[in-house]
């Protein structure tokens, strides 16, 4: 099955950290990586779509994106968008895991992809310490950097395990017709679904449907179809 999703970035190290701050907004297509991604939002607000689920983001949120997960950030120009992004090799996570601490599970999305952090300063402090260590060339830099990253990940995992952990809920369209269209698409993913067919099926103008769909979901119909088909194909591969 062909898709237009782009694999972005290559990770030659165990992990890399980026501390970015700008007001440029984002203009990034849906894409995926072969590594895990942690984003700590230190300033700003916007949206983030991960594996077909769209979330509202606010300052203090952590976004946890597993390897191969299709995602896209959505931030408007003019809003200060400060974030720390850490790319992490799945092999590194596996090597550092123990039977009772499987670090890759942090990114499996079972509870959700976005965690609202209460008192995020403690997590930010750990990230700042890691950033400072990576920028230097002091004795034991690699060992200490590895330890700081592991400490950060375990601190996040412990918060995720808290029974009152606040995971963001995906945004669900409220328009009943759009909900019906979403259900129809999911039930016919393996078929050709032209826009005209959807419009006829639901007795709605093609152009009105396209506008309403984007308004309610944040996707174009074509973009949603592509993402759902990619996720479906990935699930079939997992199942063998």
Q: In which residue ranges do the predicted regions lie?
A:
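Short acidic-glycine-tyrosine-enriched beta hairpin
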Residues: 52-66
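All-alpha amphipathic helical-bundle segments outside canonical DNA-binding/catalytic cores
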Residues: 134-151, 169-172
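A hydrophobic/aromatic-rich effector-binding and dimerization subdomain
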Residues: 1-21, 67-136, 153-164
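Short, conserved beta-strand element in jelly-roll/cupin
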Residues: 31-48, 64
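Basic/polar phosphate-binding segments, predominantly the helix-turn-helix DNA-binding elements
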Residues: 180, 184-232, 238-239
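Regular secondary-structure segments
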Residues: 42, 124-138, 182, 186-189, ...
């Amino acid at each position: 099955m062909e898709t237009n999703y782009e694999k972005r970035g290559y990770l030659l190290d165990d992990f890399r950290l980026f501390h970015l701050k700008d007001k440029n907004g984002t203009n990034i297509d849906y894409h995926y990586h072969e590594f895990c991604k942690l984003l700590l939002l230190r300033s700003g607000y916007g949206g983030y779509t991960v594996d077909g689920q769209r979330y509202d983001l606010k300052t203090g949120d952590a976004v946890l994106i597993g390897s191969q997960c299709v995602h896209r950030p959505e931030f408007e120009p003019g809003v200060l968008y400060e974030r720390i992004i850490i790319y992490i090799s799945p092999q590194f996570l596996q090597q550092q895991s123990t039977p009772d601490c499987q670090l890759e599970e942090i990114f499996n999305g079972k509870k959700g992809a976005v965690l609202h952090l209460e008192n995020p300063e403690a997590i930010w402090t750990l990230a700042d310490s890691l950033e400072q260590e990576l920028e230097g060339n002091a004795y034991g830099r690699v060992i200490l950097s590895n330890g700081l990253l592991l400490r950060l990940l375990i601190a996040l995992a412990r918060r995720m395990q808290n029974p009152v952990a606040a995971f963001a809920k995906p945004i669900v369209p409220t328009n009943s017709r759009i909900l019906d269209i979403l259900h129809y698409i999911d039930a016919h993913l393996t078929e050709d679904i032209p826009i005209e067919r959807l419009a006829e099926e639901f007795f709605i103008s093609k152009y009105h449907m396209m506008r309403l769909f984007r308004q309610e979901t944040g996707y174009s119909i074509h973009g949603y179809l592509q993402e759902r088909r990619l996720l479906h194909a990935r699930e079939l591969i997992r199942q063998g």
